[in-house]
Amino acid sequence: SLVVTFFPHPGKLTHPDKIQLIQTLNQRLDEISQYQVDMALIIPFDRKFSEISPHDFVTGILHTKLHAEHVIVGSNFKFGKNRSGDVNTLKELCAFWNICVHLVSPVTLNHEHVSSSAVRRFLSAGRIEKANEYLGKPYAIRGRIIKGHSRGRTLGFPTANLFPENEILPKGVFISQSTLDGRKYRSLTNIGFRPTFQSGRGKDETVNVETYLI
Protein backbone atom coordinates (compact mmCIF):
# COMPACT_ATOMS: atom_id res chain seq x y z
CA SER A 1 0.00 0.00 0.00
CA LEU A 2 1.13 3.52 -0.79
CA VAL A 3 -0.02 6.93 0.44
CA VAL A 4 0.51 9.77 -2.02
CA THR A 5 0.82 13.27 -0.62
CA PHE A 6 1.77 16.57 -2.21
CA PHE A 7 4.23 19.14 -0.96
CA PRO A 8 3.85 22.01 -0.83
CA HIS A 9 0.08 22.15 -0.47
CA PRO A 10 -1.44 22.85 -3.93
CA GLY A 11 -3.12 25.94 -2.51
CA LYS A 12 0.29 27.39 -1.67
CA LEU A 13 0.95 27.69 -5.39
CA THR A 14 -2.24 29.55 -6.24
CA HIS A 15 -3.00 31.37 -2.97
CA PRO A 16 0.21 31.38 -0.90
CA ASP A 17 -1.11 33.91 1.63
CA LYS A 18 -4.49 32.25 2.18
CA ILE A 19 -3.61 28.63 2.95
CA GLN A 20 -2.14 27.81 6.36
CA LEU A 21 -1.09 24.22 6.91
CA ILE A 22 -2.51 22.30 9.87
CA GLN A 23 0.52 20.00 9.99
CA THR A 24 4.15 20.26 9.00
CA LEU A 25 5.34 17.75 6.43
CA ASN A 26 7.17 15.77 9.11
CA GLN A 27 4.04 15.65 11.27
CA ARG A 28 2.07 14.36 8.30
CA LEU A 29 4.62 11.64 7.59
CA ASP A 30 4.75 10.66 11.26
CA GLU A 31 0.98 10.24 11.28
CA ILE A 32 1.01 8.18 8.09
CA SER A 33 3.62 5.89 9.66
CA GLN A 34 1.18 5.01 12.45
CA TYR A 35 -1.02 3.14 10.00
CA GLN A 36 -0.35 -0.12 8.17
CA VAL A 37 1.07 1.56 5.10
CA ASP A 38 4.10 0.23 3.24
CA MET A 39 5.37 3.59 2.09
CA ALA A 40 4.55 7.25 1.48
CA LEU A 41 5.27 9.10 -1.75
CA ILE A 42 5.80 12.87 -1.64
CA ILE A 43 5.10 14.46 -5.02
CA PRO A 44 6.58 17.98 -5.37
CA PHE A 45 3.68 20.23 -6.34
CA ASP A 46 5.14 22.93 -8.57
CA ARG A 47 3.88 24.96 -11.52
CA LYS A 48 4.81 22.22 -14.00
CA PHE A 49 2.97 19.53 -12.05
CA SER A 50 -0.10 21.76 -11.71
CA GLU A 51 -0.40 21.79 -15.52
CA ILE A 52 -0.85 18.01 -15.78
CA SER A 53 -4.21 17.00 -17.22
CA PRO A 54 -6.45 14.45 -15.48
CA HIS A 55 -5.71 11.97 -18.29
CA ASP A 56 -1.94 12.34 -17.93
CA PHE A 57 -2.17 12.04 -14.14
CA VAL A 58 -4.00 8.73 -14.32
CA THR A 59 -2.09 7.31 -17.28
CA GLY A 60 1.37 8.67 -16.58
CA ILE A 61 1.46 8.49 -12.79
CA LEU A 62 -1.16 6.10 -11.41
CA HIS A 63 -0.80 3.50 -14.16
CA THR A 64 2.68 3.83 -15.67
CA LYS A 65 4.73 4.88 -12.65
CA LEU A 66 2.82 3.50 -9.67
CA HIS A 67 1.18 0.46 -11.30
CA ALA A 68 -1.90 1.16 -9.20
CA GLU A 69 -4.62 -1.47 -8.94
CA HIS A 70 -6.78 0.30 -6.36
CA VAL A 71 -7.09 4.03 -5.63
CA ILE A 72 -8.79 5.45 -2.53
CA VAL A 73 -9.85 9.12 -2.50
CA GLY A 74 -12.37 11.35 -0.78
CA SER A 75 -15.72 11.84 -2.50
CA ASN A 76 -14.88 15.51 -3.15
CA PHE A 77 -11.49 14.72 -4.71
CA LYS A 78 -10.35 17.10 -7.46
CA PHE A 79 -7.28 16.65 -9.63
CA GLY A 80 -5.63 17.78 -12.83
CA LYS A 81 -5.06 21.23 -14.29
CA ASN A 82 -7.37 23.82 -12.74
CA ARG A 83 -8.97 21.03 -10.66
CA SER A 84 -10.77 19.97 -13.83
CA GLY A 85 -11.10 16.32 -12.83
CA ASP A 86 -13.43 14.93 -10.17
CA VAL A 87 -14.25 11.44 -8.90
CA ASN A 88 -16.34 10.67 -11.97
CA THR A 89 -13.43 11.65 -14.20
CA LEU A 90 -11.14 9.49 -12.08
CA LYS A 91 -13.44 6.46 -12.32
CA GLU A 92 -13.77 6.83 -16.08
CA LEU A 93 -10.02 7.17 -16.70
CA CYS A 94 -9.07 4.44 -14.24
CA ALA A 95 -11.57 1.99 -15.73
CA PHE A 96 -9.54 1.93 -18.95
CA TRP A 97 -6.56 0.57 -16.99
CA ASN A 98 -8.67 -1.72 -14.77
CA ILE A 99 -7.90 0.40 -11.71
CA CYS A 100 -10.60 0.19 -9.04
CA VAL A 101 -11.58 3.50 -7.45
CA HIS A 102 -12.86 3.52 -3.85
CA LEU A 103 -14.52 6.61 -2.37
CA VAL A 104 -14.41 7.69 1.27
CA SER A 105 -17.67 9.37 2.29
CA PRO A 106 -17.57 12.72 4.10
CA VAL A 107 -17.58 12.68 7.90
CA THR A 108 -20.24 14.89 9.48
CA LEU A 109 -20.08 16.36 12.96
CA ASN A 110 -22.65 18.77 14.39
CA HIS A 111 -24.36 18.92 10.97
CA GLU A 112 -21.13 20.12 9.33
CA HIS A 113 -18.67 18.27 7.14
CA VAL A 114 -15.36 17.66 8.90
CA SER A 115 -12.82 19.41 6.71
CA SER A 116 -9.43 21.07 6.87
CA SER A 117 -11.15 24.42 6.27
CA ALA A 118 -13.29 23.97 9.38
CA VAL A 119 -10.27 22.93 11.46
CA ARG A 120 -8.32 25.98 10.25
CA ARG A 121 -11.24 28.22 11.15
CA PHE A 122 -11.45 26.86 14.70
CA LEU A 123 -7.69 27.03 15.24
CA SER A 124 -7.45 30.60 13.97
CA ALA A 125 -10.23 31.58 16.39
CA GLY A 126 -8.43 29.88 19.29
CA ARG A 127 -11.22 27.30 19.65
CA ILE A 128 -8.86 24.44 20.43
CA GLU A 129 -11.44 22.06 21.92
CA LYS A 130 -13.57 22.38 18.79
CA ALA A 131 -10.56 21.91 16.52
CA ASN A 132 -9.49 18.85 18.51
CA GLU A 133 -12.99 17.40 18.19
CA TYR A 134 -12.81 17.71 14.41
CA LEU A 135 -9.23 16.44 14.28
CA GLY A 136 -10.02 13.48 16.50
CA LYS A 137 -6.86 14.21 18.50
CA PRO A 138 -5.10 17.16 20.19
CA TYR A 139 -3.65 19.79 17.88
CA ALA A 140 0.14 19.61 18.01
CA ILE A 141 2.83 22.23 17.50
CA ARG A 142 6.36 21.18 16.70
CA GLY A 143 9.51 23.26 16.94
CA ARG A 144 12.89 23.71 18.54
CA ILE A 145 13.64 25.29 21.88
CA ILE A 146 15.34 28.67 21.68
CA LYS A 147 16.79 30.97 24.30
CA GLY A 148 14.33 33.52 25.61
CA HIS A 149 14.74 36.51 27.93
CA SER A 150 14.88 34.26 31.05
CA ARG A 151 12.23 36.40 32.73
CA GLY A 152 10.24 33.34 33.78
CA ARG A 153 13.33 31.78 35.33
CA THR A 154 13.96 34.99 37.27
CA LEU A 155 10.43 34.80 38.67
CA GLY A 156 10.82 31.11 39.52
CA PHE A 157 8.70 29.86 36.62
CA PRO A 158 11.15 28.80 33.91
CA THR A 159 9.53 28.30 30.51
CA ALA A 160 10.66 26.67 27.29
CA ASN A 161 10.52 29.10 24.39
CA LEU A 162 9.64 27.36 21.15
CA PHE A 163 10.49 28.38 17.59
CA PRO A 164 7.47 26.77 15.93
CA GLU A 165 7.44 25.04 12.56
CA ASN A 166 3.65 25.17 12.34
CA GLU A 167 1.84 27.94 10.49
CA ILE A 168 -1.33 28.11 12.59
CA LEU A 169 -0.67 29.37 16.10
CA PRO A 170 -3.96 29.77 18.00
CA LYS A 171 -3.69 32.58 20.54
CA GLY A 172 -4.36 31.85 24.19
CA VAL A 173 -3.18 29.97 27.27
CA PHE A 174 -3.71 26.23 27.08
CA ILE A 175 -3.31 23.14 29.23
CA SER A 176 -0.96 21.04 27.14
CA GLN A 177 1.33 18.04 26.98
CA SER A 178 4.91 18.53 25.86
CA THR A 179 7.37 15.96 24.56
CA LEU A 180 11.07 16.61 25.11
CA ASP A 181 13.74 14.03 24.28
CA GLY A 182 11.06 11.35 24.07
CA ARG A 183 9.65 12.12 27.52
CA LYS A 184 6.16 13.55 28.01
CA TYR A 185 5.40 16.35 30.49
CA ARG A 186 2.23 18.04 31.65
CA SER A 187 2.55 21.68 30.73
CA LEU A 188 0.92 25.08 30.40
CA THR A 189 1.45 26.84 27.09
CA ASN A 190 0.99 30.49 26.16
CA ILE A 191 0.73 31.38 22.49
CA GLY A 192 0.59 35.03 21.56
CA PHE A 193 2.13 38.28 22.64
CA ARG A 194 3.94 38.20 25.95
CA PRO A 195 1.19 38.79 28.51
CA THR A 196 3.31 40.50 31.15
CA PHE A 197 6.21 42.31 29.53
CA GLN A 198 6.35 44.98 26.87
CA SER A 199 9.22 46.27 24.80
CA GLY A 200 10.23 49.92 24.80
CA ARG A 201 7.99 50.41 21.76
CA GLY A 202 4.96 48.91 23.48
CA LYS A 203 3.61 45.40 23.19
CA ASP A 204 5.99 42.83 21.73
CA GLU A 205 4.62 42.27 18.20
CA THR A 206 6.22 38.84 17.78
CA VAL A 207 3.99 35.83 18.36
CA ASN A 208 5.63 33.67 21.00
CA VAL A 209 5.13 30.07 22.07
CA GLU A 210 6.16 29.59 25.69
CA THR A 211 5.60 26.41 27.68
CA TYR A 212 5.93 25.89 31.41
CA LEU A 213 6.69 22.23 32.14
CA ILE A 214 4.94 20.94 35.27
Predicted segments, located by residue:
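Core alpha/beta nucleotide-donor-binding catalytic domains of modification enzymes
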Residues: 1-64
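Short N-terminal signal/transit or membrane-insertion segments
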Residues: 1-6, 22-40, 137-167
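Active-site donor-binding loop signature of nucleotide-sugar glycosyltransferases
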Residues: 45, 106, 164
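Classical nucleotidyltransferase
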Residues: 51-158
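Short secondary-structure boundary segments
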Residues: 44, 75, 191-193
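Phosphate/ribose-recognition catalytic cores of enzymes acting on nucleotide-derived substrates
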Residues: 148-214
